[in-house]
Amino acid sequence: MDALKILLLFLLPVVFSSCKEKLDPHSVVETNRRQIERTELDDWIHANLVTPYNVEVQYRWNKNTAGKGTYVYPPKLEKVKDVLEAVCELGFELYTNPELGGENFLKGRSSLRIVLYGGGNPDNNGVELLYNPQTSAAEISLYNVNDFDPKKAETLYVLLRSFHHQMAKRLMELMPYERDAFLKISEARYTRGSTDLIAPPLGSYTTPKEKFGLNGWANMRGFYTMLSFLSAEDDFAEIVSTTLVSSPQEINDAAKRAATPEDADEPDPDPSVHQRYAKEAEQAHKEFTEKQKFVDAYIKKEWHIDFLRMQLMSVRRIDIYLKNH
């Protein structure tokens, strides 16, 4: 027994020495960890997004965040706050306005995470997407941060289109809509996520509004925008997003385009073709307005918000924002 005690006394220093080596602060593991210091921007984010809305923001680069097959890069630090200020003022403050959802509209719901990227998010067909299809609706991906200018209406337009599209999807998940009923309206037209159909016409567009705005070609097929073709979820979210950055007159004009036969300017001499165009326009307008009413009713029932009032307030706030910058 005495010999065993002596052996243990001899081994204990060796064991502790080994543990000390494993926990050495200068180990390879520790030296590879980046110690991130809290900045004024972090404090601002905590005060304006984390505390009131339970929204996490990732603006520091993390290569694991971007999905496979995408080419994205980090945002410029000096652009981050401008983008987040716009999102706060024209996004979160809109939903929580006392006349709309109220200050508790987002409270008690699961958290959101906003991830910022410096450039765009083109797919294999070169079509710019407003969101990252490889992430869940709990993550809002904001692209083209490096191009954002609070004085330029077009860059603000794209930012808000992206934000409202993704916000709508998150709320649709938290407060489910009758997906099957909505899907039936334009079911045969959806491309199941493929951009093959919309890539050719989109390829000729150069401005953000042409790419992401209300589109005549889409209207004449019962949709608000080109991205609406991708799925029922995209269609629903596009109706919400586009409405919140467009005037009622612009939406009404889109509905009129939906009801316009393709040969309206120059009627086809073949009566059967002319009649076919008329029937297609009738169907497109039916789908356009039916989906519009569906979304209005959903927002009224589930969000307890008058969508027209929300639209008018959103457009007014955008105008004020641009004038102040």
PLM features: residue spans?
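Acidic/polar, low-complexity intrinsically disordered N-terminal segments immediately downstream
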Residues: 19-107, 285-325
